[in-house]
Amino acid sequence: MKLPIYLDYSATTPVDPRVAEKMIECLTNEGNFGNPASRSHAFGWKAEEAVENARRQVAELVNADPREIVWTSGATESDNLAIKGVAHFYASKGKHIVTTKIEHKAVLDTTRQLEREGFEVTYIEPGDDGIVTPAMVEAALREDTILVSVMHVNNEIGTINDITAIGELTRARGILFHVDAAQSTGKVEIDLEKIKVDLMSFSAHKTYGPKGVGALYVRRKPRVRLEAQMHGGGHERGMRSGTLATHQLVGMGEAFRIAKQEMAQENERIRALRDRFYKQVEHLEELYVNGSMTARVPHNLNLSFNYVEGESLIMALKDLAVSSGSACTSASLEPSYVLRALGRNDELAHSSIRFTFGRFTTEEEIDYAAQKVCEAVTKLRELSPLWDMFKDGVDISKVEWQAH
């Protein structure tokens, strides 16, 4: 077993070797290196063929028409293009947008920008299980609502929202529905023929593909219109200009092809690994699972260890790659805004660790990780005066601390 052990698959995944192999074929002079937009010679035609094949592979995972897939540089760009693109195009219809307090920053910072431009945004608070229900969405809708954006799977706590039911609601009201699906491809079945989602963001690097590439699903029937955010040569039917990076797109296509083929058995294997890990740590006192345990992807276990500082626990677990909060915001020392939205107090939010498992995680690694977590939590609590007070029956929330 090689140390350190990677248990941070929701931050990024390693590129699957089969994906890397396909990508390498599109780089050098011997390979398929042409510009897909070069229409006048065979190098361009061959590159375009590879790109369109990849587009088909992405579409097949989510049962969409390949013409509905727009290439982007990642889910952050897809979120920006979807939300700003719709807001600017449909601004004459209304200026109200609905989203949730637990979205990824790529959605929240985009809606904040639109607020500065004069749009109004309602931020839904989820239940304490981390789920945003259709009833919550319905309560937030107004006459002038033009867009609802609700994530499929949460990046910090792994909870799954019922986008099928929310889609029925938005379609009945004639409101566009955007879903950030960066964390759900290859983990949850998605059928865009059946569900009434108008826009959906995808990322390659959360699904064993390369970083720096993603896609946006833009529904054709009923047709969704967007205002482009990136201008240039008019690539991607004018929605997203810029030379297509054949190797990146081929990588994403292959990653999504593998995801479609292997998702069912991979989910079962990962669920068994997660359960095995949890069984070995659940005896720890004052252990809290963040988010619903049922409406959740098996890859994610977000735990709060009360009376242990999350940062010090991460330092103590130096052989384990885990995170507190999401990778995009874990550099700040603020407690997780997602856990705060669930109603967790600052102490519990600060003591949370996200363990995320994936394709290359082994049973041996799980057992080692669980043992290390138990040792570290026990040791850190032995050093904690708060833990002593708690064990002595003191209600710490009622203690009045003296300032010196």
From Swiss-Prot:
One of its GO terms (cellular component) is L-cysteine desulfurase complex. The keyword Glycoprotein does not apply. It holds the Pfam family Aminotran_5. Pathway: Cofactor biosynthesis; iron-sulfur cluster biosynthesis. One of its GO terms (biological process) is [2Fe-2S] cluster assembly. It is found in: Cytoplasm. Its cofactor is pyridoxal 5'-phosphate. The active site is at 328 (cysteine persulfide intermediate). Signal peptide: none annotated. InterPro entries: Aminotrans_V_dom, Aminotrans_V_PyrdxlP_BS, Cys_deSase_IscS, Cysteine_dSase, PyrdxlP-dep_Trfase, PyrdxlP-dep_Trfase_major, PyrdxlP-dep_Trfase_small. Its main location: cytoplasm. It catalyses: (sulfur carrier)-H + L-cysteine = (sulfur carrier)-SH + L-alanine. One of its GO terms (molecular function) is pyridoxal phosphate binding. The keyword Metal-binding applies. Pyridoxal 5'-phosphate binds at residues 75-76, 155, 183, 203-205, 243. The modification N6-(pyridoxal phosphate)lysine is found at residue 206. Its EC number is 2.8.1.7. Keywords: 2Fe-2S, Cytoplasm, Iron, Iron-sulfur, Metal-binding, Pyridoxal phosphate, Transferase. PROSITE patterns: AA_TRANSFER_CLASS_5 (PS00595). [2Fe-2S] cluster binds at residue 328. Homodimer. Forms a heterotetramer with IscU, interacts with other sulfur acceptors. Belongs to the class-V pyridoxal-phosphate-dependent aminotransferase family. NifS/IscS subfamily. NCBIfam families: IscS (TIGR02006), PRK14012.1 (NF010611). Master enzyme that delivers sulfur to a number of partners involved in Fe-S cluster assembly, tRNA modification or cofactor biosynthesis. Catalyzes the removal of elemental sulfur atoms from cysteine to produce alanine. Functions as a sulfur delivery protein for Fe-S cluster synthesis onto IscU, an Fe-S scaffold assembly protein, as well as other S acceptor proteins. This is Cysteine desulfurase IscS. The lineage of its organism: Bacteria, Pseudomonadati, Pseudomonadota, Gammaproteobacteria, Pseudomonadales.
